[in-house]
Amino acid sequence: MQQTAWAPRTSGIAGCGAGGVVMAIASVTLVTDTPGRVLTGVAALGLILFASATWRARPRLAITPDGLAIRGWFRTQLLRHSNIKIIRIDEFRRYGRLVRLLEIETVSGGLLILSRWDLGTDPVEVLDALTAAGYAGRGQR
């Protein structure tokens, strides 16, 4: 059976949250100067908020009977077949490493970019599933 929902890995989100908690504890107990305490406290709060918002936005991309559901931190966007112009993979080298992004371009001119972090897997696998579901490729409705 084909996978129909993609989300960031639970371990990655938990790692960010745990790192934020450890940093917050270190900020209160280990850092003695006020500016350092404020900076590490703000960084800890940022990590905790990032982990919370990322957890809330799961699954990031899902194939539903109504269309493609793309969840963000604050809302879910539903894209029907008629709203999607093209779905493609963008590949480029960054720091000697090949990076792939899944790009979903809408008819209204919007561009949604999803990385491996967002999808929890290789974007090429997601594109294959979207092609099999009729959202991309020659069989596009």
Swiss-Prot record:
It comes from Mycobacterium tuberculosis (strain CDC 1551 / Oshkosh). The chain crosses the membrane at residues 12-32, 35-55. It comes from the Bacteria. Keywords: Cell membrane, Membrane, Transmembrane, Transmembrane helix. It is found in: Cell membrane. Its main location: membrane. Disulfide bonds: none annotated. It is a multi-pass membrane protein. This is Uncharacterized protein MT0013. GO terms for cellular component: plasma membrane.
